[in-house]
């Protein structure tokens, strides 16, 4: 059996994998052991009390994190005329229609979010096989297909994140960076949990927020007492 490294022993001494920590304490531990040479992301995994195999229990949506994500997102918008001008004024990085679609088909995808006005979906629909697998396909359920493209752009720039439950009933998300103070991370997680609660399927029975754990990109995971997450 291989010997534990000094860091692994320190983590093992300080973090009890069976304990539920108050959110502030959990985040403090995650930040303490996030020792990579870059500003690690602080991530969360939420186990929901749903049956992800049932179509009426798929949890999906978007939420603007009050303290941002620590990453500046580049936003592309499919719009024309007045809507295109509104998108540019709101801070969109790329705005177009057929020209933007041609760039995407050519492999030019220097953006993190794609937004479309409803009338542009005739063009965007042809890009499903390219945008879909990358999680970039606009969808009205998360506010990225909308006549109000300006608000959608501002939300994306302000730190909006999309969430969707996976096949195991878990929602994964990023709530900030190691450099964020604990209060900002707490506020972001509370906003995400509030959005998940609002998206609870009517057919979901029993305990909805079953397990919550926080971690960093290269670091340890710490379980959180759900009662300590104040929305």
From Swiss-Prot:
A Gene Ontology BP annotation from the UniProt entry: translation
Gene Ontology CC annotation, any one: cytosolic large ribosomal subunit
An example molecular function term from Gene Ontology annotations: rRNA binding
Keyword line: Repressor, Ribonucleoprotein, Ribosomal protein, RNA-binding, rRNA-binding, Translation regulation, tRNA-binding
Keyword rRNA-binding included in the entry's annotation: yes
SUPFAM superfamilies documented for this protein: Ribosomal protein L1
Protein's job: Binds directly to 23S rRNA. The L1 stalk is quite mobile in the ribosome, and is involved in E site tRNA release. Protein L1 is also a translational repressor protein, it controls the translation of the L11 operon by binding to its mRNA.
Family of the protein in this entry: Belongs to the universal ribosomal protein uL1 family.
PANTHER family for the chain: 54S RIBOSOMAL PROTEIN L1, MITOCHONDRIAL, LARGE RIBOSOMAL SUBUNIT PROTEIN UL1M
Protein known as: Large ribosomal subunit protein uL1
Organism: Polaromonas naphthalenivorans (strain CJ2)
Gene behind the chain: rplA
